[in-house]
Amino acid sequence: MESERDRGLWITWYNLPEQGKDDYLSWLHETYLPGLLKRPGFLWAAHYASLDEEKIPRRTSGAKFTTDDPAVPRGDRYILVCGAEDTNVFGNPLPRELHAGLPAEGRKMLAMRIGERLNVMAEAARVAGPEAKNYQEGMMLAPCIQLGSFQCPWQDEEDALAWYARWRMPAMSKLPGCIRARKLASVAGWAKQAILYEFTSPDARNHFLHSHEDGDSNREWTDKVVRSLMHSPGSANVARRLWPYPFTPA
């Protein structure tokens, strides 16, 4: 199926200064991203702005841990995701090699990024949500996403695998407003795993808390798995799509 061709993802998290931000966004959306999509193997690209925490209902039970390693860049306000058939597309050339070959103006724009962090990931599993049948944008990542990226001690990885396979992903396949859920495994970058949920809108995402989290009959297991994860800075991000348009209003 065409919708299952995009198994490789290049994900970049970063922040921007206020000064020059509008010029950067215009360049990214009008020049940089259209240019990427002309490259062999690139299937789609989507750019997101993370929502402020006060706009995001979160689960209130259990603990969540975020790395405080100073070597891990802490950008998370913008998320850029590119999809390809597999991760080799992002290995030849590497992102840094691709960027080194840009014109001077492009390199100047990229230098505005603060706390830039990237992962190249392969899709390990996918489920379709109830809204998949109505989604009109094919492989394109949804108007709203929740993206968690993390490490897990190897001793706990089998339990986390079972929890996602037996509980979380089957539950997402039934959650109103959900288009897809994808489990990702890293081939490059600090985070070794990620979970990517796709929603029709931020309001639809909030059902994740009320319809799913609050009704979790596996709460003890859920809390055990959550405690075993060490998240990237800002994870799990909830974000609205800025490009391609139309984007989801904040």
Regions found by a protein language model. Name each.
Residues M1-A250:
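Macromolecular interaction modules
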